[in-house]
Amino acid sequence: EAAVDRLAMLYQQATNALRSALKQYLKDRTPPSAAHCAFRYPELRLTYHCQGEVPSSVRAYAKVQVPGTYAVTVTQPDAFRTYLLDQLRPLMSDFTVTVEVGPSQANIPYPYVVEQGDELGASGVTAAELARVFPSTDLSAANDGTADGLYDWEDQDPLPLALFDAARTDFSLRRLVHYTGSDWRHVQPWILLTNYHRYVDQFIRHGLNMLQADSRFLQGNSPSEGITLVNIGVGPSNAKNITDHLAVLRPHCWLMIGHCGGLRQSQTIGDYVLAHAYMRRDGILDRVLPPNIP
């Protein structure tokens, strides 16, 4: 917990300093001094000193494969606190590791600390001018190289500690706000994806019934463990875009219900149904998944 607490403290200090400097610049065009422009993401660094131990757990998460140093930049550590603790506790318990927390070399882009864009629009300062004074968004840094395995284990130092670093996460969090019109924190850890309007309508009706005053659902469930329903009937490219952004939230599970999720009139529950896999001709995933895989 001390490591996560320090991540939160460093992140808060950096974002507060960036907001303060940005506010001052909008007021009187005073740029931040060199001593006050270290607006950096915190970094979580873990060194694995292999002592020959063989962890008994067969879990697919919270484990390291080879001795060495692993690192990742972190954003919004308070919001991701539970996730971070769930990963770090078993790592520190089952492996001989050293955990360090400190500022990284990656700057926080100024758009990621501005909650409302109106204050920028009313200031008369252009985005191009702000980008010359403050760290700005670098889309080349927000990539899926780690998640897609597009890196060399032998030459990478440090090794990636997580699938998504701070730049990639912040980019997707802002996209979720843009696409949904609501806070990204509203997305629940259980996600249901579908491209059929009738499924959406049915789940909405079911959800409204569950929210009735006398519902057993409300009596036995925590408000933080809900379901988010996403209609992805917007084409394969947009559907991939949606899931790319949702992935940084590290949901417990997501499930897609397409055409094969429904029963025909001639079928009953218990019948064996073979789902059809389509041969991909859209080219959306060809870069990360061989085209011969359905």
Model-identified regions with their sequence ranges:
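Accessory terminal and edge-of-domain segments that mediate assembly/interaction
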Residues: E1-C253, G262-P294
